[in-house]
Amino acid sequence: MIKHLHDTHFHLDLQKDKHGAIENITKNEIYTITMTNLPDLYQKEVSLYGQKYIRIALGFHPELVHEYPNKITLMWKYLAEARYIGEVGLDFTDKSHAKEQIAFFSELIARCKNDSNKIISIHSRGAENEILDIIGTNFKFTPILHWYSGTMGNLRKVCDRGYYFSVNSSMIRTKKFAQMMEYIPSDKILLETDSPFTSNKISHVESLKIVNEFLESHGIDCWENFLKLIGA
């Protein structure tokens, strides 16, 4: 079986050179789930960029929910058709708009809870307890925790509930990730870049190769995990 690279958390809409990014993805056959930060961008990107190697996710970044409440109805409009959801979640770096974030994320989870076809990439910075509480233990969608930075206690809870984790090149250099590796099941680890937010000055494909090779050295087959994720 031919093994490909994949990227479960990428921001095509924020790339300086979108067409160059698409060419790179296609040339290197990188199966990519690209996030959107607002729901009106989703339909635009599906029509312009959706193809074999690019899956467009419907998203509403938590830090933007309070700024664009008029766009929430668009999220619900497109939700039924979108298999991939992201970037969504909670960000409590600044808690001044936590109430709006919680209300939106709670409604999103309620609408997706029984949909086994949905794959949701979740942002959880500083809000892991709330994420766990809102999602609970009774859900049919597939959650992916993107760039997890929470406690080991919450990590164990997340692992027990069957979440996936997406891992980037900035994460694998940390002592914390070495600790995380002791708990995360090997069949629940996926690749991501979070490009353009990762600080490493390397190409999209090189960033993925570095992480993939690191994980392979620990006996983790991320490509097999990705195929399982998408049901291929």
For the regions a protein language model found, what residue spans apply to each?
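Mid-domain alpha/beta scaffold segments of enzyme catalytic cores
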Residues: 1-232
